[in-house]
Amino acid sequence: MNRLLNNPEQVVDEMLAGYIASYPDRFCKLDGYHVLLNKNEKDKVSIVIGAGGGNEPWPIGYVGEGLADACSLGNVFAAPTAKSILNAIRYVPNEKGVLCIATNHAGDVL
């Protein structure tokens, strides 16, 4: 089976970089973390999604206009770190509150 990976250790970083390069006016990355951020701040309750990265990085598709404000991704087959999620919460507009959505990932309970 062939793969489309440059380096398995960098797959989440490269995926986020490619997504941001495709939509530079809409998204940015939180430095030092696997966090995709919506650049369009809103006067609303912010939504932060936490989920594993790698094979099925579905949360990035939910970040955008009228949807989630950030997603925090873990490495391949791993949940995001608490520090990564906390920094995403701190970065998004949080005056009206933040709704956190987390998946039932095996890494969450280890």
Regions found by a protein language model. Give the residues of each.
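Fold-independent oxyanion-binding glycine-rich loops
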Residues: 23, 50-53, 70-71, 102-105
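Structural motif
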Residues: 44-48, 75, 96-100
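Conserved active-site and cofactor/substrate-binding residues in soluble primary-metabolism enzymes
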Residues: 7-14, 42, 54, 58, ...
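N-terminal glycine-/lysine-enriched basic segments
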Residues: 94-110
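Glycine-rich oxoanion-binding loops at beta->alpha junctions
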Residues: 55, 61-95
